[in-house]
Amino acid sequence: MTMRRRLGAAVVAVALVGVVSGCSSSPSTAATVGNTAVAMESVDDAVEHCSKFINPSSELTPRQIIASTVIRGAVAQEVLDKRGAKLSDAERDQIVARNGMAALDSDQVCHTMVRSFAGVFHLFDLEGDRKAKADLSAVDVKANPRLGSW
């Protein structure tokens, strides 16, 4: 499976974990994850830099996949923070490489995005599917309607 397809498959799988509900209260906010605001600028930057890595045959647009990746990375971080768990950059980089996403390292914006998303893989590795899905779904997420339906 190509790196593009792995990223797309991972994002779609994680997007199915739970439905993002509600609306973000500010046009400059892509989502509110727990008490953390995810800036729309971070999604826009990631779309600009990382769309080239997304499989164009996907059922979701590159913007939807990338927005989901950015937001799910924040959701995973919220779960890790609640546990007091730390995941170093080196550990995140190992997860990225192990899951076939190292090509994203060629662009700093994409590298930052996928490093954040590595927290999702870490939770699945650490807890197993059922617990990780439950923990990720339990996080309160309000998405900006500009990002489409969730």
Where on the chain are the PLM-derived regions?
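Bacterial N-terminal signal peptides that target proteins for export
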Residues: M1-V11
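Bulky hydrophobic/aromatic packing residues
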Residues: G8, S51, P145-R146
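Hydrophobic alpha-helical targeting segments used for export or membrane insertion
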Residues: V12-L16
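C-terminal motif of bacterial Sec signal peptides marking the signal peptidase cleavage site
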Residues: G18-G22
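N-terminal targeting/tethering segments
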Residues: S25-V114
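PPIase-associated folding chaperone regions across multiple families
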Residues: V33-G34, V96-W150
